[in-house]
Amino acid sequence: MGSQNSSLDLRRVGVHAWSWFTLASTFLLLCSGGIVTSKGVGMSVPDWPTTYGYNMFLFPISGWVGGIFYEHAHRLIASGVGLLTMILAAWLLAVEPRRWVKNLGVIAFVAVCVQGLLGGLRVSLFKDEIGIFHALLAQSFFCLLGIITIATSPKFFRGGWDVFIPDPVLKKLALLSTVLIFVQLALGATMRHEHAGLAIPDFPLAYGEILPDTAPTALDAINTKRLADDIVPTSAAQIWIQMAHRGVAIGIFLAVVSVALRAFRNLVARRALVWSCIWLLMIFCQVLLGAWTIWSNKAADVATIHMALGALSLFLGVIFCFRLHRGIQAGRFCVPDTQTARDFSSIA
Protein backbone atom coordinates (compact mmCIF):
# COMPACT_ATOMS: atom_id res chain seq x y z
CA MET A 1 0.00 0.00 0.00
CA GLY A 2 2.83 2.36 0.89
CA SER A 3 4.62 1.67 -2.40
CA GLN A 4 1.41 2.36 -4.33
CA ASN A 5 0.97 5.72 -2.59
CA SER A 6 4.61 6.54 -3.24
CA SER A 7 4.21 5.69 -6.92
CA LEU A 8 1.06 7.81 -7.14
CA ASP A 9 2.80 10.76 -5.46
CA LEU A 10 5.71 10.44 -7.88
CA ARG A 11 3.34 10.52 -10.86
CA ARG A 12 1.61 13.58 -9.44
CA VAL A 13 4.92 15.37 -8.93
CA GLY A 14 5.91 14.41 -12.46
CA VAL A 15 2.78 15.75 -14.12
CA HIS A 16 2.99 18.92 -12.01
CA ALA A 17 6.60 19.51 -13.06
CA TRP A 18 5.62 18.91 -16.69
CA SER A 19 2.77 21.41 -16.30
CA TRP A 20 5.23 24.01 -15.03
CA PHE A 21 7.57 23.34 -17.97
CA THR A 22 4.71 23.67 -20.45
CA LEU A 23 3.54 26.88 -18.76
CA ALA A 24 7.02 28.44 -18.87
CA SER A 25 7.46 27.41 -22.50
CA THR A 26 4.12 29.00 -23.35
CA PHE A 27 5.18 32.28 -21.76
CA LEU A 28 8.35 32.15 -23.88
CA LEU A 29 6.11 31.58 -26.90
CA LEU A 30 3.98 34.60 -25.98
CA CYS A 31 7.09 36.77 -25.76
CA SER A 32 8.33 35.39 -29.07
CA GLY A 33 5.02 36.24 -30.73
CA GLY A 34 5.15 39.69 -29.17
CA ILE A 35 8.58 40.32 -30.67
CA VAL A 36 7.37 39.16 -34.09
CA THR A 37 4.43 41.59 -33.99
CA SER A 38 6.41 44.46 -32.44
CA LYS A 39 9.07 44.20 -35.13
CA GLY A 40 6.45 43.78 -37.88
CA VAL A 41 8.09 40.62 -39.23
CA GLY A 42 5.08 38.30 -39.15
CA MET A 43 5.18 37.89 -42.92
CA SER A 44 8.94 37.37 -43.17
CA VAL A 45 8.16 33.74 -43.93
CA PRO A 46 5.32 33.91 -46.48
CA ASP A 47 4.43 30.21 -46.63
CA TRP A 48 3.00 27.74 -44.11
CA PRO A 49 3.46 25.01 -42.87
CA THR A 50 6.67 25.05 -44.90
CA THR A 51 9.41 27.66 -44.59
CA TYR A 52 10.42 28.92 -48.02
CA GLY A 53 9.53 25.50 -49.39
CA TYR A 54 11.55 23.60 -46.78
CA ASN A 55 10.16 21.33 -44.13
CA MET A 56 9.85 23.69 -41.16
CA PHE A 57 12.20 21.59 -39.03
CA LEU A 58 14.82 21.25 -41.78
CA PHE A 59 15.13 24.88 -42.80
CA PRO A 60 18.89 25.62 -42.94
CA ILE A 61 20.30 27.76 -40.15
CA SER A 62 22.09 29.89 -42.73
CA GLY A 63 18.67 31.25 -43.70
CA TRP A 64 17.85 32.40 -40.17
CA VAL A 65 18.54 36.09 -40.82
CA GLY A 66 16.65 39.31 -40.16
CA GLY A 67 12.93 38.95 -39.66
CA ILE A 68 13.06 35.32 -40.78
CA PHE A 69 14.90 34.46 -37.56
CA TYR A 70 12.12 35.80 -35.33
CA GLU A 71 9.22 34.33 -37.30
CA HIS A 72 10.85 30.93 -37.83
CA ALA A 73 11.93 30.71 -34.18
CA HIS A 74 8.35 31.53 -33.18
CA ARG A 75 7.08 28.63 -35.29
CA LEU A 76 9.57 26.20 -33.80
CA ILE A 77 8.75 27.25 -30.23
CA ALA A 78 5.05 26.90 -31.06
CA SER A 79 5.65 23.37 -32.34
CA GLY A 80 7.45 22.54 -29.11
CA VAL A 81 4.60 23.91 -27.00
CA GLY A 82 2.16 21.85 -29.05
CA LEU A 83 4.16 18.70 -28.34
CA LEU A 84 4.45 19.52 -24.63
CA THR A 85 0.70 20.10 -24.41
CA MET A 86 -0.09 16.85 -26.19
CA ILE A 87 2.07 14.94 -23.70
CA LEU A 88 0.50 16.84 -20.78
CA ALA A 89 -3.04 16.01 -21.94
CA ALA A 90 -2.16 12.33 -22.41
CA TRP A 91 -0.45 12.22 -19.01
CA LEU A 92 -3.49 13.73 -17.30
CA LEU A 93 -5.81 11.25 -19.00
CA ALA A 94 -3.57 8.41 -17.82
CA VAL A 95 -2.96 9.30 -14.16
CA GLU A 96 -5.31 12.10 -13.10
CA PRO A 97 -8.27 10.85 -10.99
CA ARG A 98 -10.32 14.07 -11.21
CA ARG A 99 -12.48 14.32 -14.31
CA TRP A 100 -12.48 18.12 -14.42
CA VAL A 101 -8.69 18.21 -14.55
CA LYS A 102 -8.68 15.58 -17.31
CA ASN A 103 -11.15 17.76 -19.22
CA LEU A 104 -8.91 20.80 -18.82
CA GLY A 105 -6.05 18.81 -20.33
CA VAL A 106 -8.17 17.87 -23.35
CA ILE A 107 -9.34 21.47 -23.77
CA ALA A 108 -5.73 22.66 -23.63
CA PHE A 109 -4.75 20.21 -26.37
CA VAL A 110 -7.65 21.29 -28.61
CA ALA A 111 -6.81 24.94 -27.94
CA VAL A 112 -3.16 24.57 -28.91
CA CYS A 113 -4.16 22.80 -32.15
CA VAL A 114 -6.59 25.60 -33.02
CA GLN A 115 -3.94 28.14 -32.09
CA GLY A 116 -1.44 26.58 -34.47
CA LEU A 117 -4.03 26.58 -37.24
CA LEU A 118 -4.85 30.25 -36.62
CA GLY A 119 -1.16 31.12 -36.79
CA GLY A 120 -0.88 29.34 -40.13
CA LEU A 121 -4.02 30.95 -41.53
CA ARG A 122 -2.75 34.37 -40.44
CA VAL A 123 0.16 33.84 -42.83
CA SER A 124 -1.66 31.99 -45.60
CA LEU A 125 -4.62 34.38 -45.80
CA PHE A 126 -2.69 37.49 -44.71
CA LYS A 127 -5.53 38.61 -42.43
CA ASP A 128 -4.86 40.92 -39.48
CA GLU A 129 -8.22 39.92 -37.97
CA ILE A 130 -6.98 36.34 -37.60
CA GLY A 131 -3.90 37.67 -35.84
CA ILE A 132 -6.12 39.35 -33.23
CA PHE A 133 -7.94 36.09 -32.44
CA HIS A 134 -4.58 34.30 -32.49
CA ALA A 135 -3.27 36.69 -29.81
CA LEU A 136 -6.34 36.38 -27.58
CA LEU A 137 -6.42 32.59 -27.75
CA ALA A 138 -2.74 32.57 -26.78
CA GLN A 139 -3.52 34.59 -23.64
CA SER A 140 -6.46 32.32 -22.77
CA PHE A 141 -4.38 29.19 -23.33
CA PHE A 142 -1.67 30.54 -21.03
CA CYS A 143 -4.22 31.10 -18.26
CA LEU A 144 -5.71 27.63 -18.78
CA LEU A 145 -2.28 26.07 -18.32
CA GLY A 146 -1.93 28.08 -15.11
CA ILE A 147 -5.10 26.49 -13.71
CA ILE A 148 -3.84 23.03 -14.69
CA THR A 149 -0.47 23.70 -13.04
CA ILE A 150 -2.16 24.74 -9.81
CA ALA A 151 -4.63 21.84 -9.88
CA THR A 152 -1.79 19.33 -10.17
CA SER A 153 0.29 20.85 -7.36
CA PRO A 154 0.86 19.00 -4.05
CA LYS A 155 -0.43 22.06 -2.19
CA PHE A 156 -3.73 21.84 -4.05
CA PHE A 157 -4.04 18.14 -3.20
CA ARG A 158 -3.45 18.95 0.47
CA GLY A 159 -6.26 21.52 0.43
CA GLY A 160 -3.97 24.54 0.54
CA TRP A 161 -6.14 26.29 -2.05
CA ASP A 162 -9.32 25.72 -0.03
CA VAL A 163 -8.63 28.07 2.89
CA PHE A 164 -11.89 29.75 3.85
CA ILE A 165 -12.12 33.32 2.44
CA PRO A 166 -15.75 34.40 3.00
CA ASP A 167 -16.01 37.41 0.69
CA PRO A 168 -18.11 37.03 -2.49
CA VAL A 169 -17.85 40.78 -3.12
CA LEU A 170 -14.06 40.51 -3.35
CA LYS A 171 -14.45 37.70 -5.87
CA LYS A 172 -16.84 39.80 -7.98
CA LEU A 173 -14.46 42.76 -7.95
CA ALA A 174 -11.56 40.51 -8.95
CA LEU A 175 -13.65 38.96 -11.73
CA LEU A 176 -14.64 42.40 -13.02
CA SER A 177 -10.98 43.48 -13.04
CA THR A 178 -9.97 40.32 -14.90
CA VAL A 179 -12.67 40.78 -17.54
CA LEU A 180 -11.55 44.38 -18.04
CA ILE A 181 -7.96 43.20 -18.50
CA PHE A 182 -9.08 40.71 -21.16
CA VAL A 183 -10.99 43.49 -22.96
CA GLN A 184 -7.86 45.62 -22.71
CA LEU A 185 -5.74 42.87 -24.22
CA ALA A 186 -8.25 42.61 -27.07
CA LEU A 187 -7.90 46.34 -27.69
CA GLY A 188 -4.12 46.05 -27.47
CA ALA A 189 -4.07 43.15 -29.94
CA THR A 190 -6.26 45.16 -32.31
CA MET A 191 -3.90 48.12 -32.07
CA ARG A 192 -0.83 45.95 -32.65
CA HIS A 193 -2.22 44.03 -35.61
CA GLU A 194 -3.93 47.07 -37.15
CA HIS A 195 -0.69 49.04 -36.68
CA ALA A 196 -2.52 51.66 -34.61
CA GLY A 197 -0.06 51.73 -31.71
CA LEU A 198 1.09 55.23 -32.63
CA ALA A 199 -2.24 56.53 -33.90
CA ILE A 200 -1.78 59.04 -31.07
CA PRO A 201 1.91 59.99 -30.73
CA ASP A 202 1.69 61.86 -27.41
CA PHE A 203 0.77 60.93 -23.84
CA PRO A 204 -1.01 61.66 -21.52
CA LEU A 205 -2.77 64.05 -23.90
CA ALA A 206 -3.98 63.12 -27.38
CA TYR A 207 -2.77 65.57 -30.02
CA GLY A 208 -2.54 68.12 -27.23
CA GLU A 209 -6.10 67.60 -26.02
CA ILE A 210 -7.89 65.40 -23.49
CA LEU A 211 -10.23 64.18 -26.24
CA PRO A 212 -8.88 64.51 -29.79
CA ASP A 213 -10.88 66.13 -32.56
CA THR A 214 -11.33 63.55 -35.33
CA ALA A 215 -13.66 65.50 -37.59
CA PRO A 216 -12.62 65.25 -41.28
CA THR A 217 -10.91 68.65 -41.36
CA ALA A 218 -9.08 68.00 -38.08
CA LEU A 219 -8.05 64.53 -39.26
CA ASP A 220 -6.67 65.99 -42.49
CA ALA A 221 -4.56 68.40 -40.45
CA ILE A 222 -3.35 65.54 -38.22
CA ASN A 223 -2.31 63.42 -41.21
CA THR A 224 -0.63 66.36 -42.94
CA LYS A 225 1.54 66.85 -39.88
CA ARG A 226 2.18 63.10 -39.58
CA LEU A 227 3.36 62.94 -43.20
CA ALA A 228 5.62 65.94 -42.58
CA ASP A 229 7.12 64.05 -39.62
CA ASP A 230 7.52 60.92 -41.80
CA ILE A 231 4.78 59.03 -39.89
CA VAL A 232 2.15 57.02 -41.73
CA PRO A 233 -1.36 58.54 -41.79
CA THR A 234 -3.95 57.37 -39.31
CA SER A 235 -7.74 57.17 -39.19
CA ALA A 236 -10.44 58.22 -36.75
CA ALA A 237 -11.12 54.56 -35.95
CA GLN A 238 -7.47 53.93 -35.06
CA ILE A 239 -7.35 57.03 -32.88
CA TRP A 240 -10.46 56.04 -30.95
CA ILE A 241 -9.25 52.46 -30.52
CA GLN A 242 -6.23 53.88 -28.73
CA MET A 243 -8.42 56.24 -26.72
CA ALA A 244 -10.53 53.25 -25.67
CA HIS A 245 -7.30 51.46 -24.69
CA ARG A 246 -6.36 54.40 -22.47
CA GLY A 247 -9.84 54.64 -20.97
CA VAL A 248 -10.01 50.94 -20.13
CA ALA A 249 -6.53 51.22 -18.55
CA ILE A 250 -7.94 53.79 -16.11
CA GLY A 251 -10.90 51.49 -15.41
CA ILE A 252 -8.59 48.55 -14.72
CA PHE A 253 -6.43 50.57 -12.34
CA LEU A 254 -9.46 51.75 -10.36
CA ALA A 255 -10.95 48.24 -10.32
CA VAL A 256 -7.75 46.67 -8.97
CA VAL A 257 -7.46 49.47 -6.39
CA SER A 258 -10.97 48.54 -5.24
CA VAL A 259 -9.87 44.90 -4.98
CA ALA A 260 -6.91 45.87 -2.79
CA LEU A 261 -9.06 48.12 -0.58
CA ARG A 262 -11.68 45.40 -0.15
CA ALA A 263 -9.01 42.85 0.77
CA PHE A 264 -7.47 45.32 3.23
CA ARG A 265 -10.81 45.70 5.02
CA ASN A 266 -11.29 41.93 5.27
CA LEU A 267 -9.17 40.76 8.20
CA VAL A 268 -9.87 37.15 7.24
CA ALA A 269 -8.43 37.54 3.75
CA ARG A 270 -4.83 38.53 4.41
CA ARG A 271 -3.63 36.20 1.66
CA ALA A 272 -5.96 38.02 -0.72
CA LEU A 273 -4.38 41.33 0.32
CA VAL A 274 -0.92 40.14 -0.71
CA TRP A 275 -2.26 38.92 -4.06
CA SER A 276 -4.16 42.15 -4.71
CA CYS A 277 -1.18 44.36 -3.83
CA ILE A 278 1.06 42.44 -6.23
CA TRP A 279 -1.65 42.74 -8.86
CA LEU A 280 -1.96 46.48 -8.30
CA LEU A 281 1.81 46.91 -8.62
CA MET A 282 1.74 45.03 -11.92
CA ILE A 283 -1.05 47.23 -13.26
CA PHE A 284 0.81 50.38 -12.19
CA CYS A 285 3.94 49.18 -14.00
CA GLN A 286 1.81 48.29 -17.01
CA VAL A 287 0.46 51.85 -17.21
CA LEU A 288 4.02 53.20 -17.12
CA LEU A 289 5.07 50.75 -19.84
CA GLY A 290 2.13 51.84 -21.99
CA ALA A 291 3.26 55.44 -21.69
CA TRP A 292 6.88 54.44 -22.37
CA THR A 293 5.76 52.57 -25.49
CA ILE A 294 4.43 55.83 -26.92
CA TRP A 295 7.32 57.98 -25.70
CA SER A 296 9.83 55.53 -27.22
CA ASN A 297 8.07 55.66 -30.60
CA LYS A 298 6.86 52.09 -29.98
CA ALA A 299 10.31 50.54 -29.52
CA ALA A 300 10.01 46.80 -30.14
CA ASP A 301 11.53 45.74 -26.82
CA VAL A 302 9.34 48.11 -24.78
CA ALA A 303 6.18 47.11 -26.67
CA THR A 304 6.98 43.43 -26.14
CA ILE A 305 7.54 43.87 -22.40
CA HIS A 306 4.24 45.79 -22.28
CA MET A 307 2.50 42.86 -23.97
CA ALA A 308 4.19 40.29 -21.71
CA LEU A 309 3.25 42.12 -18.51
CA GLY A 310 -0.30 42.39 -19.81
CA ALA A 311 -0.36 38.61 -20.20
CA LEU A 312 0.95 38.16 -16.66
CA SER A 313 -1.65 40.62 -15.34
CA LEU A 314 -4.45 38.58 -16.92
CA PHE A 315 -2.83 35.39 -15.66
CA LEU A 316 -2.69 36.67 -12.09
CA GLY A 317 -6.29 37.84 -12.32
CA VAL A 318 -7.51 34.44 -13.48
CA ILE A 319 -5.52 32.61 -10.81
CA PHE A 320 -6.69 35.07 -8.14
CA CYS A 321 -10.34 34.54 -9.13
CA PHE A 322 -9.78 30.78 -9.01
CA ARG A 323 -8.25 31.13 -5.54
CA LEU A 324 -11.17 33.20 -4.28
CA HIS A 325 -13.68 30.79 -5.81
CA ARG A 326 -12.05 27.88 -3.99
CA GLY A 327 -11.97 29.91 -0.78
CA ILE A 328 -15.68 30.67 -0.97
CA GLN A 329 -16.53 27.08 -1.88
CA ALA A 330 -14.63 25.97 1.23
CA GLY A 331 -17.32 27.70 3.28
CA ARG A 332 -19.70 24.90 2.37
CA PHE A 333 -17.59 22.47 4.37
CA CYS A 334 -16.57 24.51 7.40
CA VAL A 335 -18.03 27.04 9.81
CA PRO A 336 -15.83 30.03 10.73
CA ASP A 337 -15.25 30.67 14.40
CA THR A 338 -17.07 33.51 16.16
CA GLN A 339 -14.21 35.99 15.74
CA THR A 340 -13.95 35.25 12.00
CA ALA A 341 -17.69 35.75 11.58
CA ARG A 342 -17.50 39.04 13.50
CA ASP A 343 -14.59 40.26 11.37
CA PHE A 344 -16.46 39.49 8.17
CA SER A 345 -19.76 41.00 9.32
CA SER A 346 -18.00 44.31 9.86
CA ILE A 347 -17.19 44.64 6.15
CA ALA A 348 -19.98 42.68 4.47
Kindly label every feature range from the protein language model:
Residues I68-I87, E129-C143, W240-S258, A303-L312:
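Membrane-interface loop-to-helix entry segments
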Residues I147-I165, V169, L173, F315-A348:
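A juxtamembrane structural motif centered on a specific transmembrane helix
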Residues A24-S32, N103-R122, L176-Q184, V274-W292:
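Small-polar-interrupted transmembrane alpha-helices in polytopic inner-membrane proteins
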Residues V36-V45, C113-L136, M191-P201, V287-A311:
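Interfacial helix-loop-helix junctions of multi-pass membrane proteins
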Residues L92-V106, P168, A260-W279, A341-D343:
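Membrane-interface helix-loop-helix junctions at transmembrane boundaries of multi-pass membrane enzymes
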Residues T37-H72, G197-Q238:
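Extracytosolic (periplasmic/ER-lumenal) interhelical loops and adjacent juxtamembrane/interface segments
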Residues M1-R12:
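Short, Lys/Arg-rich, polar N-terminal cytosolic tail immediately upstream
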